[in-house]
Amino acid sequence: MNTCVIRVYGIVQGVGFRPFVSRVCLDNNIKGSVSNKGSYVEIHAQGDNTDALFDALNHHAPKRSVILEIIKKYADEEPYEDFSIIESEKDEGEIFVSPDIAICDECKEELFNPKDRRYLHPFINCTNCGPRLTILDSMPYDRVRTSMGEFEMCPVCEKEYTSPESRRYDAQPVCCHDCGPEVYTIDLSKDIKEIIELIKNNPKDFRAYSSETGSAAITSARKAIIDGKIVAVKGIGGFHLACDATNEEAVKRLRMLKTRPMKPFAVMMRSMETIEKYCIVNGEQKELLEGPQKPIVLLENKTAGRKDSPLAPSLAPGNPTLGVMLPYAPIQLLLFDYNDSLSMPDALVMTSANASGAPICRTDEDALNEISSFTDIILSNNRKIRLRCDDSVTDFFEGKPYMIRRSRGFAPLPVMISPKVKGSVLAIGGELKNTFCIAKDSLLYPSAYIGDMEDLRSVDALNASVKRMETLLETEPSLVVCDMHPLYHTTEVAESLGLPVVKIQHHYAHILSCMAENNYFDEVIGVSFDGTGYGDDATIWGGEFLKCTPTGYERVGSIEPFIQSGGDASSKEGWRIAASIIRDNCDNGEEICRKLDLCSDTEYTMLAQMASMNINSVRSTSSGRLFDAVSAILGIRKQSTFEGEASTSLMFEAMKYAKETHFEKRDHMSRFSDISITTEGMLATNALAVKIAELFLQGEDRGMLAYAFHDVLSAMIVDKCSTISKITGIKTVALSGGVFQNTLLLRLTKERLNSLGINVLTHSLIPPNDGGIALGQALYGLFYINNK
């Protein structure tokens, strides 16, 4: 019998695709079958209305799906008696793993409906929502290949699972109170070593070491938060540390315990109404906050600096923005609302549960070993997390998401490039904000966020995550790409894998990541601005102009170098860079530093001696450290307690000035007319920093000078790009690197370049910071293999 055979490629597993196909076929009297093949969904359809099926695939597919290609052909097959979903089978080809999906509106409604059988069930899900990547063992996506495989469905759940009219038809994690995982608390007043020993001896029996289960556990966690305590909560991709975001003492205590004096905490708010009460939210931001990913979104805090703000001042000290998200897992919704008569606050701190620099805790044992000293009670569950996954964090630029950390909800969605390349490559990524990327032909799969590799627990997490993703993607890389820094842990990891290793320059990888995201492979002028990267000349780079293709680059400019003295301390203490620049560019440097209160005379002399004797000193073109220096000069931040603190504070000062003065005209530019744009082919950034210092000592406004620094630096960048463009004929500029998280500098630079008729590539869903360089490394590896 004539049979229409359809293959659908894309995100079609874990999103209710097979049930959708089954319903369409039943409605249109189409007989046949649908199955997962691992890399695609295959449909065999017999009947007069197969056009209706094809139309539904093109126009009415499940909203969580992403269809990249549909291939249709006809074959002669035996007649089918009905339409069925058949057992998944593996086949070679492209693989698409669905990210975890936030709870849908229908499940949320059922969760709080007393008449529903899943009323207050902490693991409610359906074909449209729930865990995917974090519970997956291997493809195709079926229950037996997930951590839900150990939970046998009850008859009622199984009926829903097998009924085409049910929203839970073929929903792999489906469960209920009778057959699903359970929540429980761990009492931390007991000896931690004894509890860990109980876990090791009873890995499948949480009752051996838990104190309360079910509703009692949830109520205990809620009461602890109300009482000002800190609760570790196991979510979809790991544990969070939660406390009352309106309780200043609780927030300050969490800061003290985590040794995190200033870095902002993420806040989970009860509802969109709550967010709008505290923050300014536009339409695009609201759509993302309420969408299936539900990331942390950076929003302007209406109450920042207000003494009458209900929110704790210590949430984000000195920061006009808040990182805000909505509850995306049922257990988080139940923390806000439960049938126990307790009244919860509308906002909770919800920060990753990890020791500083380490990956997010995934198991009970992780939590007990690493964060038991940070928390008063652990609210856990017995659904195993296979792959840890932090919350994604995003800003907005030009009405689109501008990713800071790409993880839950987005990873491991692939970046598809147009060149038809072949091969499998593993890119290890950066030392900080590590993610890795696996390239399989023209699909590049960036991983979820791992952490900073200076912590060996992050190195272990990287190795484990790489192995799991290779299993999920069913690929064995033939090449490893890593950063060229000889002392990075990522270099060690790459060299330990027993595969050929290619090392590429850090800032070149940044530009390649921007090119890959934009699917642009002609030659570009790359402006790669960040904190640090190992240069070809063994100095520190970070303010680079590169002429780039996917197969190579040429350094064609940089900011003016300075001496960075003090090793790791110089990356946290901007006053050192400021003093160095002033010393080497002013006759009366010591006096200027004294007047600016940058450092003592003794410290000034010590830095000068270190530089002259080449002790722990290196030549640097780091634009990140330049921002730190100007922040110190203006008395905003002399040192940073977390990466980017000083430079971000400088941006906030500039934005505050622009907002308060409705700044339009660039009349401040005249104050800088006596400094060159470039010096010996490099941006005259040292002269700019010195001029900022001179004007500040003359009494010029701090905010104006902060804004002027951004504006003049932007003009310098654009002038350099224009010069390179005229010489080379290249009309496209790619802007990447962590400094371009600064949306003020990004906007000023992009506007100026566009006004000159220059095309500008920027990031959106791939971070401009080191969390994105693995994508660039993977792109280079693919072209390397295909051009050998």
Where are these regions (language model features)?
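Conserved phosphate-binding catalytic cores of ATP/NTP-utilizing and phosphoryl-transfer enzymes
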Residues: 276-281, 334, 360-365, 391-392, ...
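A contiguous, well-structured pocket-lining segment that forms one wall/lid of small-molecule binding clefts
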Residues: 173, 180-182, 430-468, 580-730, ...
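A phosphate-binding glycine/aspartate-rich beta-alpha loop in the early core of alpha/beta enzymes
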Residues: 230, 238-303
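Intrinsically disordered, low-complexity, mixed-charge
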Residues: 1-173, 177, 184
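Short glycine-rich phosphate-binding loop at a beta-alpha junction
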Residues: 232, 474-486, 728-739
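Conserved phosphate-binding/catalytic loops in two-lobed NTP-binding clefts
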Residues: 483, 498-510, 732-736, 743, ...
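Internal gly/pro-rich beta-alpha loop/helix module
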Residues: 60, 145, 160, 168, ...
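Glycine-rich phosphate-binding/hydrolytic loop that grips phosphoryl groups
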Residues: 507-529, 533-535, 574-583, 710, ...
